[in-house]
Amino acid sequence: MSTDLLPPTLQNILDQTSLKWIFCGGKGGVGKTTTSCSLAIQLAKCRKSVLLISTDPAHNLSDAFGQKFSKDATKVNGFDNLFAMEIDPTSAIQEMVEQCMLADSNGMMGSMMQDLAFAIPGVDEAMSFAEIMKHVHVKSMEYSVIVFDTAPTGHTLRFLSFPTVLEKALGKLSSLGSRFGPMISQMSSMMGGEAGSQEDMFAKLESMRGVITEVNTQFKDPEKTTFVCVCISEFLSLYETERLVQELTAYEIDTHNIVVNQLLFPKKSSNCEHCSVRQKMQQKYLAEAHELYDEFFHIIQLPLLTEEVRGPEKLNEFSKMLVEPYVTPE
């Protein structure tokens, strides 16, 4: 193990003032929401304004802060410069389908769209991304930094790869539009559609591609974007973290922080056999994590607490452990 380890805190994120997008992700149930809320609270202490977005369909932000959030940014109680919003992909899909039904006089297109929309693999991530796109220009100008509380690993990876996939797809569509546009327009007018609607559609696609290209560039810029991996000290979680790190590297998305949550630190005088057995197991996987990541990662160790971290006060208290290493009680 290297002697000059990187500091075991997330202070490096607070110090990097150029960061615009911060993602927190990992396996389900490892404390992603608590970590993202706590990080957002710490950022609010040193940045002008912070927006916390949940892209997890389970939406735990409302539970964590004990306050109802919606798809519109809402100020978090007890803070002047911290805002939160929860993106719901399912309702966004439903909205899109309803718009199609309104535009379609005989209703056939709408019902077909409904069947299609909910059957497409990855549609949740696509709609989450589309919802963020709606806010991206306005919000990124309004807020100095945006923190994402993401869905469990698989969803997150598809979500982060979506800009690249979409950029390529829209590029192909645009080239098809220039080749087949007149024919599509003719067919559309024969079927009762407006002749100009195809040109409008391709113009919209082209402008959307511009926005997506910009976001894609920002996501791949380590000065603008970073990903905080959250895990617990168990085999499956560590395995998933390694997979996440590999995938993020393949997508060229920066990651250099790992939060290891729910660690047991039993007192020496404790005679709890279960605690000591679990602690030995945790220490084994923690040693593996250090072996894998010490050279390039800040590894933050957080304890398993006796009570839930809920409400602004408890989250604020917990957030201090992200910037000051946890000291085990004697």
From Swiss-Prot:
Top EC class for this record: hydrolase
GO BP annotation list: tail-anchored membrane protein insertion into ER membrane
One Gene Ontology term, aspect cellular component: GET complex
SUPFAM superfamilies the UniProt entry points to: P-loop containing nucleoside triphosphate hydrolases (SSF52540)
Record EC number: 3.6.-.-
Stretches that traverse the bilayer: none
Recorded superkingdom: Eukaryota
Location within or outside the cell: Cytoplasm; Endoplasmic reticulum
SS bond partners: none
Binding residues annotated for Zn(2+), in chain numbering: 272, 275
One GO molecular-function entry: metal ion binding
UniProt KW keywords: ATP-binding, Cytoplasm, Endoplasmic reticulum, Hydrolase, Metal-binding, Nucleotide-binding, Transport, Zinc
InterPro entries the UniProt entry points to: Anion-transp_ATPase-like_dom, ATPase_ArsA/GET3, ATPase_ArsA/GET3_euk, P-loop_NTPase
Active-site residue numbers: 56
Residues reported in the UniProt entry to bind ATP: 27-34, 234, 261
Entry similarity comment: Belongs to the arsA ATPase family.
Subunit text: Homodimer.
Protein function: ATPase required for the post-translational delivery of tail-anchored (TA) proteins to the endoplasmic reticulum. Recognizes and selectively binds the transmembrane domain of TA proteins in the cytosol. This complex then targets to the endoplasmic reticulum by membrane-bound receptors, where the tail-anchored protein is released for insertion. This process is regulated by ATP binding and hydrolysis. ATP binding drives the homodimer towards the closed dimer state, facilitating recognition of newly synthesized TA membrane proteins. ATP hydrolysis is required for insertion.
UniProt name for this protein: ATPase GET3
Organism expressing this protein natively: Laccaria bicolor (strain S238N-H82 / ATCC MYA-4686)
Species classification: Eukaryota, Fungi, Dikarya, Basidiomycota, Agaricomycotina
